[in-house]
Amino acid sequence: MKKRFLHFSLFIFLFFYSGLSMANLTKVASGFSAPTGIAFDSSGVMYVTNWSGDSIVKVKSNGEQETFYKGISSPSGIVIDKQDNVYVSSYSDDYILKITPNGKSKKISEGYRTPTGIAFSNNGQLLITNRSTGEIVSLDLETKQKTIVANGLSTPVGVTQLADNSLVVSQYSGRLTMIEPNGNKTELGDQFDRPGVGIVTISSNAVAVIDNGAGMVRQIDVKTKKVTNLASSLSGAVALANYNNHYYIGTWGDGSVYTMDSN
């Protein structure tokens, strides 16, 4: 009887804990086909890469959606610069696309191997996860010169940079790795199942990461390795952005984008 009571108590705890973890999530958009990357322009308009739809979708503050760009094969990572130029990686066709605010598009860099998540570095270069080669490539957007800034990774899919210029890389293999400017690597992923594309810097020592395998958003202090679970029960969580003190999470399971407070 005592054992059954303990099992029942554990069930009740997990049930309510799961409910609480979802209570602060709000669905802000739906109808996507595998939302993989999320970014915002200077006006607060959200852009979502529609992986299976080969398109990029704009979501206005009133929830209205429109197709911003069509015809990019398996769009994955997305970032937007201060001039509202949009940069997107084509996972299947191995290039980086630039789309200007007036809609003109151009392939600005090619020859990658399944480029997935992308991010701006602290000095304005484009960081690209080269999934199939296990590398992080830095692209100078002026000269278009490529530099390999990290290698020896296991299926890297997401990257972000800390204030001290260290990189933190999420890898579908289960690894989460910090690479210091001197090349030293620290493994951070002991408590992660399968880190996904979404990863963002939230302070000098902390990042938030999609744990795709666990259906969670997790925060980790890169110095202490302390992990805090921010959200759970997310079906096929892949994308993550941090904008105006809110996280935005893209889920493949139901083709939606959710938001939650990041304070």
Region locations from a protein language model:
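A short beta-strand motif characteristic of beta-propeller blades
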Residues: 24-29, 64-69, 104-109, 144-150, ...
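A short loop-to-beta-strand structural motif that recurs across blades of beta-propeller domains
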Residues: 55-58, 94-98, 135-138, 175-177, ...
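Bacterial N-terminal signal peptides that target proteins for export
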Residues: 1-9
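N-terminal, post-signal-peptide region of Sec/Tat-exported proteins
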Residues: 41-76
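Short loop/turn segments that connect beta-strands within beta-propeller blades
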Residues: 59-64, 99-104, 139-144, 179-184, ...
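An edge-strand/N-cap motif at the start of beta-rich repeat modules
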Residues: 21-48, 53, 257-261
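Beta-rich, blade/repeat-based domains predominating
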Residues: 30-43, 71-83, 95, 111-125, ...
